[in-house]
């Protein structure tokens, strides 16, 4: 099920029009199209819902543990005002993480990529969707649980 704020989704991406200034990004022609792309991509995670919070669109949902089936992680993906030029912020709202957890930034934000990686394997405004970030968060959770069990963070650092 796709969510479109208003109008219909164009078949091709219109030119970016964020410079219009006052309107939230999702109310511009490009933004409506991009929100359709984002919503369609998030259909891969049916437990996530899009809501409006504090002037931003936010996806909220749970990811389940792969190593401990009863463990659940409440995750939010918040679009910034200048999306897609700025990356959405991912936060693992619960559970709380112990101090010293590797690859965890302030406010329970997992380090999913290094900005210096750019389009190679980091955030790319043209290709990265909220769905991409949720999938990367699931990988981060798996690495976190592996680190808890073994004391070693698997794979390379973000």
What does each model-found stretch correspond to?
Residues 1-73, 82-158:
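UBC/E2-like fold recognition across ubiquitin and ubiquitin-like conjugation systems
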Residues 75-77:
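Hydrophobic/aromatic beta-strand elements that line small-molecule binding cavities or substrate pockets
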């Amino acid at each position: 099920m796709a969510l479109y704020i208003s109008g219909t989704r164009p078949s091709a991406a219109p030119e970016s029009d964020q410079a219009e200034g006052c309107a939230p990004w999702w109310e511009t022609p490009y933004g409506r199209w991009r929100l359709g792309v984002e919503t369609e991509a998030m259909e891969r995670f049916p437990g996530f819902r899009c809501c409006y919070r504090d002037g931003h669109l936010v996806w909220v949902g749970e990811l389940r543990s792969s190593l401990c089936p009863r463990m659940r992680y409440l995750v939010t993906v918040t679009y910034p005002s200048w999306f897609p030029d700025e990356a959405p912020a991912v936060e693992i709202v619960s559970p709380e993480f112990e101090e010293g957890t590797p690859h965890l930034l302030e406010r329970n934000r997992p380090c999913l990529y290094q900005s210096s990686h750019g389009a190679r394997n980091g955030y790319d405004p043209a290709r990265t969707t909220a769905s991409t970030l949720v999938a990367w968060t699931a990988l981060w959770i798996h690495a976190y649980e592996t680190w808890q069990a073994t004391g070693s963070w698997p794979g390379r650092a973000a």
